[in-house]
Amino acid sequence: GKAHEEGFPVRGEEQTVHVPCEFKEGEYTLVYRLSQPDREGEVRVTGKLMIPPLPWVGNRIGVTNEVLSPWSPLAYSGKGVIGCWNRSYTFDGPFLSQAANGGNPILRAPIRLSALIDGTDHPLTTTSTQSDMQRPDRAETSGKAVFQGTPLKVAWSNWMEYDGLTVATVALEPPPEGLTIDRLSLTMPLRPDIVKYLRGTRHMGALRNGRLPWDGKVWRRGFEPYLWVSNEYEGFLYFCESEANWVHPDGAQDLLVVKGGEDAGIALNLIS
């Protein structure tokens, strides 16, 4: 087949390089040669790479906007209310102000993002909202917001799919002279009886199976990409794909805080 050759400068004792590859079926020979301009000879390492048949690559099987059974199409009631199968979500900007499961409220108060600056807590307040998409399978909204009493500018977007998944993105723009945020916290207040069992978190590079031990009062951890709180009948699941743009001291163990009782809920300290 066609040979491809490319050189890479060596920087340090360990280095990762990306070798161009068309990723097509077949057997590839990889040859690594290490040489130094002022020395004769080279170190040569050869390896084989076998790419098996990949008949699914590039096809569109299963890619559809169809609402699959038993879910139902999204229902739009206005004023930020969107219904999905057995549930109703009410949005205030990027976050839920209420979610009801079978008519039972899950949140005991709206989800809240707040910035602590110079000892004062400034809540995020939505100033504009626009609907960007309203399909049976997916809803998209976006808008602007402010942290009351600060010069921070905020742009946000949110999308929801017919299975009840909702994802929010919030971008903060500081003033030209800069601004110090002592803490940025996202609080999800939940109905106390829902915060009974904990599941999720990482274990040896994978998601942990089974329930997590906790005393039902306070549970603290560093960054975790996934946490599910529940009782025997209902639950609330949070996930974040990475801790990119989270700012915290190394080893911090208060980035994810779960509380039970009257203060039940999940709190994320994005900046601490």
Feature annotation, model-predicted:
Residues 2-12:
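Solvent-exposed serine/threonine-rich low-complexity stretches and specific carbohydrate-binding patches
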Residues 2-4, 44, 106:
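Local beta-strand/beta-hairpin segments that build beta-sheet-rich folds
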Residues 10-12, 18-27, 36, 50-272:
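Beta-strand/loop-rich accessory regions of lumenal/periplasmic or secreted enzymes
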Residues 36-42:
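Short acidic/polar inter-strand loop motif in beta-rich domains
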Residues 45-49:
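C-terminal edge beta-strand
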